[in-house]
């Protein structure tokens, strides 16, 4: 079944410009408060100019171009400008340092980079090492260094015509981007995403939150991340809605931005919810137009209830990962919501719980969450130049092994337990980090929490809790351990406590556990 009607991304943008014309497509707000607005017609013209820019720099179908940018209009121009000429975007996490960025350049075979002045010194060093295929850099800033092989993105773009000059044959099976996973447990792998994947993601995510062309979808998620691209941007554009891209998340500014742009849909991760909850209460807390808040794991029931009550919103749970492109399990339009369930499988997907021998398990039994989709269409195509890694997670018939543990009930609602790699083995017992974190997060003095397993010569692993306290709070070890003993089985009570000012996180807000072990 062809959900997207054989339409690749170049056709999508040409059609959107024709159908929606002067309707607002994109609003970008910088951290400094600068706002840029583009209609569908204007945005398509900027995309065409950018495509022409890349063509003049020698980029052709199949070439890889890396983007190392914060949220900005140029990211959107480049993303779709590249796919219009059949080239491939390689977004780089804007928080990565030199060694990690160089590794992605080397392993993606990117020959051109678009970045900003703040990241340029790092790439100067990378070029001096001569270990990549990078031959040219475009800077989005007006001020340019006097270096060979460096151009002004804006100047070159503005010199280009608004109609596309190079239009090679495209297929929905063509690769649109290679998105490297966050690599919290190992080296990042390049997830190959096709034109079909992105078109399907737009339709699917718009369906999931019942998006209409009069909606305004605001996100603070980083543009180089799958959530921003497939759950937010592609959904908004596919529905003819307005997409608001904020440069960086600020707990103090968030609700003002939601109100300012009259956003009707947004997305949140637990870190956002917790930091929003510690902001001083305001009479304007409920003065917004949000009807859906897309939410991604993990949150305790007490935290969820407090957030929804204070801000007058409801959470639409969505479960997925880079490899699934979208939230393949989640709350569905008109469906009942059963917290803490992560929902039911969406259209075009099947989901099962399987044991260690890859056999389906009945309702109520914990095993690995496995998803069936179509590679290159409803789930990722493969890992770039890594068939061994692809074979480890993706079966020939389309079943994807997520590496997550969970269970389902008799009505087909699924429940997330934890990442397999986050299960602590303590004296013969399996302990879920997420379970403990949800319990401990209910303590009124605690703002943020992560639990990890550390080596123990007697019980395999001991449990250590790292907590961040609410401002001005003091928490003694006695109070902490008493709270744990009252709320969890004795074998689950942490052995160690460390109070910190913050916790290490990757671009998607996930805690980097290996940095704490």
Swiss-Prot record:
Presence of keyword Ligase: yes
Keywords: Ligase
Annotated GO MF terms: carnitine-CoA ligase activity; crotonobetaine-CoA ligase activity; medium-chain fatty acid-CoA ligase activity
SUPFAM superfamilies attached to this UniProt entry: Acetyl-CoA synthetase-like
Domain of life, source organism: Bacteria
UniProt cross-references to NCBIfam families, sorted A to Z: PRK08008.1
Protein name: Crotonobetaine/carnitine--CoA ligase
Pathway noted in the entry: Amine and polyamine metabolism; carnitine metabolism
Similarity comment: family membership: Belongs to the ATP-dependent AMP-binding enzyme family.
EC numbers: 6.2.1.48
InterPro entries xref list: AMP-bd_C, AMP-bd_C_sf, AMP-binding_CS, AMP-dep_synth/lig_dom, ANL_N_sf, CaiC
Lineage: Bacteria, Pseudomonadati, Pseudomonadota, Gammaproteobacteria, Enterobacterales
Enzyme class, broadest EC rank: ligase
The organism of origin for this protein: Escherichia fergusonii (strain ATCC 35469 / DSM 13698 / CCUG 18766 / IAM 14443 / JCM 21226 / LMG 7866 / NBRC 102419 / NCTC 12128 / CDC 0568-73)
Keyword Ligase among record annotations: yes
Primary role: Catalyzes the transfer of CoA to carnitine, generating the initial carnitinyl-CoA needed for the CaiB reaction cycle. Also has activity toward crotonobetaine and gamma-butyrobetaine.
Catalysed reactions listed for this entry: 4-(trimethylamino)butanoate + ATP + CoA = 4-(trimethylamino)butanoyl-CoA + AMP + diphosphate; crotonobetaine + ATP + CoA = crotonobetainyl-CoA + AMP + diphosphate; (R)-carnitine + ATP + CoA = (R)-carnitinyl-CoA + AMP + diphosphate
One Gene Ontology biological process: carnitine metabolic process
